[in-house]
């Protein structure tokens, strides 16, 4: 289904301005639909005709491959068994047509997912350099599981606490902002995959640095799993959630600094969870 998100935003003090009306073009859902330029033009014209004034172009879904000309990442050519090779620049064509129609453009990328566990497709399944850099899950049976092996997860997330992962993600942002004339950059999946991640040695060490002291009996001192799948809080339970929120918010600050160092007119946007029960598990509990 091509229309995945409609959002209107209202800001105090801007009553004299036209309010943004966004239409989000998801990369995966529209992979086959937008195999041709004509189709992109058709839907952008439709969007304009019904009152939208800004479009969000998703160019890096959960696979870690992309729909723009990149020197960092390979092109996305296969989704759900459908193979499409484009000899034209998907993102640039969206921008050109949007400008023709007077539409603003937000570009969106999935920040930390780089593979699809259900099908073993994507960057982290194809390149060994990502071994040990994906999230490590602490499962209800008390075991540790590489997220690449968890078929239930929406994406195989890289570990956001790692400096090399953050540097890699920032390089993607930098490449797009330098090479494409966009109005805004939206961070999608800029979070943890869930409350069972990440329990790697990297996160253990970073958590100790955050607290300023050693954390023994990890992860039991964070929490243990009860037989019914609920959690039994440990000594550092609350500190753990605050730490994870800080991992994400500090990265968002880095992205903002990077974008504005290149072009301070490009706005930073963020696809945030609206479900209150999920924000702690995903590191989006900013009030912490």
Please annotate each region the language model reported:
Residues 52-59, 63, 90-148, 186-189, ...:
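Glycine-rich, aromatic-flanked loop segments that form ligand/cofactor-binding clefts
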Residues 47, 55, 98, 169, ...:
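Conserved, mostly hydrophobic/aromatic
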Residues 38-65, 179-183:
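Catalytic domains of carbohydrate-active enzymes, especially glycoside hydrolases
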Residues 67-79, 113-151, 189-228, 281-287:
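Aromatic- and acidic-residue-enriched segments that line the glycan-binding/catalytic groove
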Residues 32-50, 77-101, 167-171, 246-253:
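Aromatic- and glycine-enriched glycan-recognition loops and surfaces
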Residues 17-34, 106-179, 229, 233:
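Active-site-adjacent "subsite" loops/lids of carbohydrate-active enzymes
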Residues 104-114, 186-193, 226, 237-287:
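Aromatic-lined carbohydrate-recognition surfaces of secreted/lumenal glycan-active proteins
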Residues 50-86:
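Aromatic-lined carbohydrate-binding/catalytic grooves of carbohydrate-active enzymes
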